[in-house]
Amino acid sequence: LSIAALALGAKHAIGLDVEQQAVTSSLNNISEAGFENQATILWGSIPHPQLNQKKFEVIGANISANVLIELAGPLLSCLQDDGVIVSSGVLETRLCDVTEAFRAAGGEVQSTRQIEDWTASTIIRVNGLV
């Protein structure tokens, strides 16, 4: 996701993963793609101590429905007021659960696309909430 963001014009990307092997692979891939000076890859999840309550314009989250549900509040808390979360990798059978978790945390699903059983959604913060 960091490479895609940088290739699409982001000035800097920060990636998080809970698996150390994924962090190592991401660092190698970013180096091979020539973006090593534009990306930071960290081991862990949000909230993360190295992020110091940083707010993001765009958050990409290609993680399971269970993790999205658990992190709905923290993800929205990391989002700028006019920012957007792009979630992907959610099975259609779990989409309502994810949508409800974000709604309960102060978010709103703006759009959803589906290919076969998989969905991707854009989510914003509802002003005054979170």
Model-derived regions: residue spans:
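A short SAM/SAH-binding and catalytic strip from SAM-dependent methyltransferases
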Residues: E57-E70, G89
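A short glycine-rich, Lys/Arg-flanked "PGG" loop and its adjoining helix->strand segment in the class I
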Residues: I69-V84
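Short alpha-helix immediately C-terminal to the canonical SAM-binding loop
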Residues: V23-T24, L68, L95
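Active-site capping/gating segments
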Residues: V90-V130
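Residue-level signal for inorganic ion chemistry
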Residues: S26, S64, F102
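Conserved SAM/SAH cofactor-binding pocket of Class I
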Residues: L1-S45, K55
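A short acidic, Gly/Pro-enriched loop at the edge of an enzyme's catalytic core
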Residues: P47-I59
